[in-house]
From Swiss-Prot:
Keywords, in A-Z order: Ribonucleoprotein, Ribosomal protein
Gene Ontology terms, MF aspect: structural constituent of ribosome
Taxonomy, superkingdom: Eukaryota
Recorded family membership: Belongs to the eukaryotic ribosomal protein eL38 family.
Coiled coil: none
Gene name of the encoded protein: RpL38
Family annotation (InterPro entries): Ribosomal_eL38, Ribosomal_eL38_sf
Listed name of the protein: Large ribosomal subunit protein eL38
Keyword Ribosomal protein: yes
Transmembrane feature ranges: none
GO biological process entries: cytoplasmic translation; protein-RNA complex assembly
Any matching Pfam family: Ribosomal_L38e
Source organism phylogeny: Eukaryota, Metazoa, Ecdysozoa, Arthropoda, Hexapoda
Amino acid sequence: MPREIKEVKDFLNKARRSDARAVKIKKNPTNTKFKIRCSRFLYTLVVQDKEKADKIKQSLPPGLQVKEVK
């Protein structure tokens, strides 16, 4: 089941969890979507600002698998 997250802090906390497996980053002309696969849910964060999206991408944990989908 997918769940949408509105806050960046909540998203980064979910990314640091032990059951977080992978992050998919989908870039559109208007927004960027970050999708974290955890054991039970798929969490999604939608960001309109491209600079903010780059900062979030740099803030992801280094052990997490990151895949960019275009």
